[in-house]
Amino acid sequence: MALLTTGKPFIRDLEQYGALGVYAPLEGGYEGRYQRRLRATGYNVLHITARGLGDLSAYLTGIHGVRPPHLGKKNIGREAAVGPVYFIPPIATYQLENLPPKSKGLVIWIIESFVLSSEEKQYLINLSQQEPRLKFVLELGGERYFRWQPLSKSLIAA
């Protein structure tokens, strides 16, 4: 691998396919370089983890309820036994609506994506095709060097 990479093939593939599966060295560092190149190209990057996401469609494109940890406190008779529900705006839709005017789009970088099912990965592929300003990069595992492939090809291999 070259000492200095421009990241142009990575950005070109991301714009072409909309969703990429990434395999990065486990010691880290490489993904930050590619995220910096995405920001320099004009994309906004949002980092989330795949663990605990729940329903992807509700989390990314619909208003969804979450329950904060109760920390041992109970409100007898006022709320449910498991605590109150707070409603949160959709993450991807809200970010897309508030993009700067000169931004190319939003890249959602999802770490620990190996926990996602193939149906959830297929949903992300379809969502990136429906909304052209929305792109996804999923970290699928470790490798000795930084490599990527279209997410649709990684679904076929799985």
Curated annotation (Swiss-Prot):
Keywords, alphabetical: Membrane, NAD, NADP, Plastoquinone, Quinone, Thylakoid, Translocase, Transport
InterPro entries according to UniProt: NAD(P)H-quinone_OxRdtase_su_N
Signal sequence region: none
Recorded catalytic activity of this chain's protein: a plastoquinone + NADH + (n+1) H(+)(in) = a plastoquinol + NAD(+) + n H(+)(out); a plastoquinone + NADPH + (n+1) H(+)(in) = a plastoquinol + NADP(+) + n H(+)(out)
EC number(s) reported in the record: 7.1.1.-
Keyword Membrane listed: yes
Similarity-based family: Belongs to the complex I NdhN subunit family.
Official protein name in the record: NAD(P)H-quinone oxidoreductase subunit N
Taxonomic source organism: Microcystis aeruginosa (strain NIES-843 / IAM M-2473)
